[in-house]
């Protein structure tokens, strides 16, 4: 085979029928490339008398001064469907990067299958921040691959047993416990929980566990009929509340796993002719800006996005600097407003 001029990795990729990042990984012996493909790439490289650009390789060993934020969200979705909580997180992370002299590369990752290749092969960033309500159970293999490749990364979310990597997240259990205790102190006893309670939604699951623990502390048992799945959108909260009301189960409060779910639930209650909080008290979780401006203003659990952004950036930079780093849980704060004042 003949190539005009000096052969490049793009030439090898074309002849081997693979991507340029795959060629780069094969040439450096990455285990991500299977043996057959690697041998084909190496054979073509030899035939083309391809030489690795050592100057470019040495540049890749230097810090780029850039961090990558991989956001778990479908880029084809309407912007209005993105939880405003993550807007606050993005702002906090951006400010923290600026304080540390780092640029920030933001990428939607809902449709991605290779987190590392999305940034590393083009030398875009020194490490990754994973952000979103990610199903890290399904992503465990990809997280483990990042560890094995020596990729520096931190993730926002609940610290799960056996989960690879460093996590920074709010104390979701305590938040669920505190807000349910508040409802109980208002005299509520039939408290519904709207939000997924499975391990595929670890943040919601921890909030639900805190909710159940608070009920037990007051001598009450959780009732499966009072838990209804919902994701973090107003529409999902509205639908979940409608389904709950259709069951005919008597309730005097709704503990929602997020503010958006709570706001959707309040709409469903109004449509059903029920008053908030006189008939049904409602609480949320996140303390997004809208929580204070809806009517009635929403009682919620505030997550400290400023501290969260700072910790995510600082821990990632520490990892890049080869320093030991541990996961951390951030305290939350109960914010009482009109929607829960049931008494």
Task: Name each region found by the language model.
Residues 1-65:
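N-terminal helix-turn-helix DNA-binding module of bacterial transcription factors
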Residues 1-4, 62, 66-181, 246, ...:
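Alpha-helical recognition/docking segments in bacterial nutrient-uptake
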Residues 47-53, 109-113, 266:
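Short gly/ser/thr-rich secondary-structure transition/capping motifs
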Residues 70, 130-131, 194, 255, ...:
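Short hydrophobic segments within beta-strands
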Residues 75-88, 106-115, 134, 168-178, ...:
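Hinge/beta->alpha junction and helix N-cap segments in small-molecule ligand-binding domains
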Residues 190, 222-225, 276-281:
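Short acidic capping loops at alpha-helix termini that bridge into adjacent secondary structure
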Residues 238-343:
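Flexible loop/turn connectors
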């Amino acid at each position: 085979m003949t190539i005009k001029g000096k052969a490049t990795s793009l030439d090898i990729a074309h002849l081997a029928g693979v991507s340029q990042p795959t060629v780069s990984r094969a040439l450096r012996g990455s285990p991500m490339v299977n043996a057959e493909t690697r041998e084909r790439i190496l054979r073509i490289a030899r035939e083309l008398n391809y030489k690795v650009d050592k100057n470019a390789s040495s540049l890749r060993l230097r810090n780029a001064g850039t961090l990558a934020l991989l956001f778990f969200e479908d880029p084809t979705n309407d912007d209005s469907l993105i939880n405003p909580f993550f807007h606050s997180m993005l702002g906090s992370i951006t400010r923290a990067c600026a304080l540390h002299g780092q640029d920030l590369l933001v990428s939607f990752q809902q449709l991605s299958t290779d987190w590392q290749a999305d940034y590393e092969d083009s030398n875009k960033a020194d490490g990754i921040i994973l952000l979103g309500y990610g199903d890290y159970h399904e992503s465990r293999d990809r997280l483990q691959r990042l560890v094995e490749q020596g990729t520096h990364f931190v993730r926002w979310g609940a610290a799960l047993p056996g989960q690879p990597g460093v996590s920074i997240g709010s104390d979701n259990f305590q938040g669920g416990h505190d807000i349910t205790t508040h409802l109980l102190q208002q005299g509520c006893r039939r408290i519904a929980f709207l939000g997924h309670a499975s391990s595929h939604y670890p943040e919601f699951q921890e909030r639900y566990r805190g909710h159940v623990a608070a009920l037990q502390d007051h001598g009450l048992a959780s009732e499966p009929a009072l838990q209804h799945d919902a994701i973090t959108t107003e529409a999902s909260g509205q639908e979940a509340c409608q389904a709950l009301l259709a069951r005919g189960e008597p309730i005097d409060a709704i503990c929602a796993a997020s503010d958006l779910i709570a706001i959707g639930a309040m709409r469903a209650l109004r449509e059903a002719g029920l008053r908030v909080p006189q008939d049904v008290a409602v609480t949320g979780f996140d303390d997004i800006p809208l929580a204070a401006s809806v009517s009635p203003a929403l009682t919620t659990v505030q997550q400290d996005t400023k501290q969260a952004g700072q910790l995510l950036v600082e821990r990632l930079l520490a990892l890049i600097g080869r320093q030991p780093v541990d996961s951390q849980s951030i305290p939350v704060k109960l914010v009482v407003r009109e929607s829960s004042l049931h008494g």
